[in-house]
């Protein structure tokens, strides 16, 4: 069984992306209040993520990202998908009899195979 990493390694990963490489602190286990590093400014044009809650929009349908709102809004006003003619041509129609593992059709009689 693989070992679960300690919370210290998660803090170190978090701090790596939040601080510049030339930070005065070399201790990766300290928190942001204990080791004030130089914060990386947020790039313009990118949406700001809500730390710890970015995944909630995928489960509850609320989106803070503009491109996700466009996709969700267009999906609400569109009609439900329907089977195309190519699916019917491939033998996936609902009326087609289903084959059982022995090569028999499900609509065949219960008698012995001939």
Curated annotation (Swiss-Prot):
A single Gene Ontology CC term: mitochondrion
Lineage top rank: taxon: Eukaryota
Biological process according to GO: cell differentiation; liver development; TORC1 signaling
Region (Disordered): 22-47, 75-114
Disulfide bond sites: none
Record-stated family: Belongs to the PPDPF family.
Protein name, entry field: Pancreatic progenitor cell differentiation and proliferation factor
